[in-house]
Amino acid sequence: MANLLFALAAYLIGSVSFAVVVSKLMGLPDPHSYGSGNPGATNVLRTGNKKAAILTLIGDALKGWLAVWLAARFGPAHGLNDTGLAMVALAVFLGHLFPVFHRFAGGKGVATAAGILLAIDPILGLGTLATWLIIAFFFRYSSLAALVAAIFAPFFHVLMNGVDVMAGAIFVISVLLIARHRQNIAKLLAGKESRIGEKKKV
């Protein structure tokens, strides 16, 4: 029961879309209505409002980190086990992808996944972030960097901790993240994907 309750709480935390919340508070258009239509920091940046994009990035990452950290810190005393913690990690990610508060129209989950990984293990999170930065620096594609980081994240965890239930959760998160980038994959293959720094009209 504890596992389910913590997972439900994590899903609700993940369902808070900071792209939508920040945009509304700052008088910007709904991120679903322009650019890629994705409620995430990259799309919010297309408005030209860097502050809004940064706040969105921080908020989405923080909710992933907070849900897992709180569960790991206080959950065991209430009956949460390793399987439950893995469920929490997956649930907060699913909340971001399919938010109940925003008609289940969520983002792609890159920032939230980063927060989750940092909470599971800071070294794991930083290693995955370093992978993103390296690919982004050399190729200038945010989506490609996210895809490569998603592929490596489960392997990093297994190398550090072996095959466990959390490895399974991270693998599922990675698969879902890659699936959410299917349009980006098509654009990358067609040579039509936007590079980092390019602006699109809102």
From Swiss-Prot:
GO cellular component terms attached to this protein's record = plasma membrane
- Broadest EC class assigned to this enzyme: transferase
Query: Which positions, given as ranges, span the membrane?
Result: 2-22, 82-102, 119-139, 158-178
UniProt GO MF annotations: acyl-phosphate glycerol-3-phosphate acyltransferase activity
Which GO BP annotation is one of this protein's? phospholipid biosynthetic process
EC number(s) reported in the record: 2.3.1.275
- Location(s), subcellular: Cell inner membrane
Superkingdom of the organism of origin = Bacteria
Residue ranges of coiled coil? none
**Membrane topology designation:** Multi-pass membrane protein
Keywords tagged on the record: Cell inner membrane, Cell membrane, Lipid biosynthesis, Lipid metabolism, Membrane, Phospholipid biosynthesis, Phospholipid metabolism, Transferase, Transmembrane, Transmembrane helix
User: Which InterPro entries does the record match to this protein?
Assistant: G3P_acylTferase_PlsY
> Which reactions fall under this protein's catalytic activity?
an acyl phosphate + sn-glycerol 3-phosphate = a 1-acyl-sn-glycero-3-phosphate + phosphate
Q: Quote the pathway field.
A: Lipid metabolism; phospholipid metabolism
Q: Does the keyword Ribonucleoprotein apply?
A: no
Stated role: Catalyzes the transfer of an acyl group from acyl-phosphate (acyl-PO(4)) to glycerol-3-phosphate (G3P) to form lysophosphatidic acid (LPA). This enzyme utilizes acyl-phosphate as fatty acyl donor, but not acyl-CoA or acyl-ACP.
The family line of this record is: Belongs to the PlsY family.
How is this protein organized at the quaternary level?
Probably interacts with PlsX.
- Cross-referenced NCBIfam families, in alphabetical order? glycerol-3-phosphate 1-O-acyltransferase PlsY
Annotated protein name in UniProt: Glycerol-3-phosphate acyltransferase
Q: Which organism is it from?
A: Cupriavidus taiwanensis (strain DSM 17343 / BCRC 17206 / CCUG 44338 / CIP 107171 / LMG 19424 / R1) (Ralstonia taiwanensis (strain LMG 19424))
Organism ancestry: Bacteria, Pseudomonadati, Pseudomonadota, Betaproteobacteria, Burkholderiales
